[in-house]
Swiss-Prot record:
Its main location: cytoplasm. This is Urease subunit gamma. The keyword Transferase does not apply. It is found in: Cytoplasm. Disulfide bonds: none annotated. The keyword Cell inner membrane does not apply. It comes from the Bacteria. GO terms for biological process: urea catabolic process.
């Protein structure tokens, strides 16, 4: 299977999000990369489903809650930027204050 670097990045984000979801289900608090992976995966999948940039920017801030993260993680994340493929092309989605 020949994958482009971008496709490899998408797969890594997806795999990291799967691991993070499993940890959340077991009650383990998320670290920085896991929180970013969950938010990023949400945005990428939402774009694939046809959701709008504005909708994903708003909804992406409600994917991970502060109580589900290790101490200090919410303060480290001021924004998450994700390049996602929408039906009309690739766009940069910025989720401001992604953990509340």
């Amino acid at each position: 299977m020949n994958l482009t670097p971008r496709e490899k990045d998408k797969l890594l984000i997806s795999l990291a999000a799967i691991v993070a979801r499993g940890r959340l289900e077991r009650g383990v608090k998320l670290n920085h990369p896991e929180a970013v992976a969950l938010i990023s995966d949400f945005v990428v999948e939402g774009a694939r489903e046809g959701r709008s940039v504005a909708d994903l920017m708003q909804a992406g801030a409600h994917v991970v809650r502060a109580e589900n993260c290790m101490e200090g993680v919410p303060e480290m994340l001021h924004s998450v930027q994700v390049e996602a493929t929408f039906p009309d092309g690739t766009k940069l989605v910025t989720v401001h204050h992604p953990i509340r």
